[in-house]
Amino acid sequence: MESKNTSLTNTYDIVSRFATEGTVADIRPLGNGLINDTYKVSTKEADAPDYVLQRVNTTVFTNVDMLMDNIAAVTRHIRKKLEAANVTDIDRKVLRFIAADGGKLYHREADGTVWRMMVFIPNAKTYEAVTPEYSYFAGNAFGHFEDMLVDIPEKLGEVIPDFHNMEFRMKQLREVIEKNPAGRVGEDAVKQLLDLIGKDAEEMCKAERMGREGKLPKRVCHCDTKVNNMMFDEEGHVLCVI
C-alpha cells in the first residue's frame, strides 16, 4: 500500500502545478477518506475560489489516465445537462476539475505520486451518519445521477476490472474457502454467513448473466454509492454526487 505521509510544505509546490486563481493562504487536511489524501487549499483573494487538492491512491487506481478521462466525460456531460435545463448555481452542483501543467487533469510528481485538484464547493457538507432520511436522499440523488448519464456519448473505461462482478467475487470466495488461510471456515458464525451467501449467490450473479444474454443493457454506475459521497447545502438539500 502507498505511504500516506505527505508534507504540507510539499503541497504548496504541488498546487503551483495547477492552473488555479488567487494566492494560496493555507493548506489543511480535509475529511477522513480511507483511499486518497485530501486537502483544502484556501486562497487569500475574496474573488478567487478555494480548492480541494487530492493525492490519488495509485495502488487502488492504477490507470490514472482512464480514471480522469472518465471523470472528465461524466462531469462535462452532467454540466451540459444542467445548463440545458437552465439550472442555477451549477458550479455547486457538479464538480469542476482544474488542469495541471501540460493540460491533463492530474499532476504526477517525480516520486510517482499523482495529484488532482478541483474547485471547493462553499457552504456544503457531507454526512457520515446513515439515517432513513439521508438514505432516501442518497437513493434519490444517485438515481438522478444515473439518469443524467443514460445518454453519455463517450464510452467509459473500467478503471478497476471486475470490481462489482459478482461471479468473479464468488469465484474468489470459493477459492479462499478452499484454502481456509485463517482456519475459520469451520466456525459457527462463519458457516452461517457462508450459508447465507450461498443461498443468495444465484440471485447475486443474475445481473452478469442477463448482461451476457443481452437482457440487461450496460449502464454507467457510480460504484461507491454512500451517503458521504454526496454534498448537501446548509438546508440539508443534496447539491451533487462526488
Q: Locations of the language-model features?
A:
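Pre-DFG segment of protein kinase catalytic domains
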Residues: C240-I242
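ATP-dependent phospho-/nucleotidyl transfer catalytic cores
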Residues: E2-N5, R28-N32, Q54-D65, I121-A141, ...
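ATP-binding glycine-rich phosphate-binding loop
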Residues: T20-E45
